[in-house]
């Protein structure tokens, strides 16, 4: 599929701190909250459903200016909150390799199996808090080679 050697891109200038890892059996949690009691039709809803034993990881990452997570994917979904700084991420399946910017106080969802890179292109530390679900015993991160459509991103 690839001509020549394909190298994964490693994280640079990233300091991870694991807060907790917990193991869960099948999860089937659903909640629905009426947010407009007068209308009774306006609901907020959440659903978490897993089949099989899962590991839940909660961690904080501090990424110095110019730092990068390198190209990678995850075997399960992650919820990412940008605590401070600005996260700039790129998706391998985006033909234009356009940056997506997430400011402090906002977040994004990584559905899992999406090859991407998150970088700190700002001038202050980027701090993220991440909650990841992965199959029990699996590594949370899978290193990936830099995609051909993102040549302007040296080292991911």
Residue ranges and their predicted role:
Residues 103, 112-139:
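Ligand-binding loop in jelly-roll beta-barrel domains
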Residues 71, 89-90, 98, 110, ...:
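Short beta-strand His + acidic residue motifs that chelate non-heme Fe in jelly-roll/DSBH
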Residues 63, 94-113:
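Short acidic-glycine-tyrosine-enriched beta hairpin
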């Amino acid at each position: 599929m690839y001509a020549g050697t394909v190298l994964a891109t490693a994280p640079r200038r990233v300091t991870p701190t694991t807060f907790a890892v917990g193991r869960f059996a099948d999860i089937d949690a659903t909640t629905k909250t009426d947010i407009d009691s007068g209308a009774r039709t306006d609901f907020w809803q959440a659903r978490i459903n897993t089949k099989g034993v899962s590991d839940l990881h909660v961690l904080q990452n501090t990424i110095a200016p110019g730092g990068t997570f390198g190209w990678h994917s995850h075997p399960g979904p992650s919820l990412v909150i940008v605590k401070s700084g600005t996260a700039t991420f790129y998706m391998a399946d985006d033909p234009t390799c356009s940056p997506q910017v997430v400011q402090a106080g906002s977040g994004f969802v990584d559905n899992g199996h999406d090859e991407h890179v998150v970088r700190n292109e700002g001038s202050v530390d980027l701090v993220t808090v991440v909650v990841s679900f992965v199959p029990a015993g699996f590594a949370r991160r899978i290193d990936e080679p830099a995609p051909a459509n993102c040549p302007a991103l040296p080292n991911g």
